[in-house]
């Protein structure tokens, strides 16, 4: 994957979805109609954070390279150099996957 030349604004985050495997360990092929929309993603870039009512910048909790769980229907899909990414708000990130 080539690093996209895009910088999210405010409290937005650019992520690359981690696709669900098409073939399970037992050799069972999963058809596209049976796959759920992926909920795991890798953080590619983060915005500077949002401003509070006093004009102070509140930094985003995730950082580039973090693996995260995201809301199924949050964000906007974008294509950059033929690859699919999602831009979403920090609120659409449910958790950081550790370990």
UniProtKB/Swiss-Prot annotation:
Keywords: Chaperone, Cytoplasm
Organism domain of life: Bacteria
Cell location: Cytoplasm
GO cellular component, one term: cytoplasm
PROSITE patterns xref list: CHAPERONINS_CPN10
GO biological process, alphabetically ordered: chaperone cofactor-dependent protein refolding
InterPro entries: Chaperonin_GroES, Chaperonin_GroES_sf, Chaprnonin_Cpn10_CS, GroES-like_sf
SUPFAM superfamilies per record: GroES-like
GO terms, molecular function: ATP binding; metal ion binding; protein folding chaperone; protein-folding chaperone binding; unfolded protein binding
Keyword Chaperone: yes
Chief localisation class: cytoplasm
PANTHER family noted in UniProt: 10 KDA HEAT SHOCK PROTEIN, 20 KDA CHAPERONIN, CHLOROPLASTIC
Function: Together with the chaperonin GroEL, plays an essential role in assisting protein folding. The GroEL-GroES system forms a nano-cage that allows encapsulation of the non-native substrate proteins and provides a physical environment optimized to promote and accelerate protein folding. GroES binds to the apical surface of the GroEL ring, thereby capping the opening of the GroEL channel.
The family this protein is said to belong to: Belongs to the GroES chaperonin family.
Subunit structure, as described in the record: Heptamer of 7 subunits arranged in a ring. Interacts with the chaperonin GroEL.
Protein name: Co-chaperonin GroES
Native source organism of the sequence: Methylacidiphilum infernorum (isolate V4)
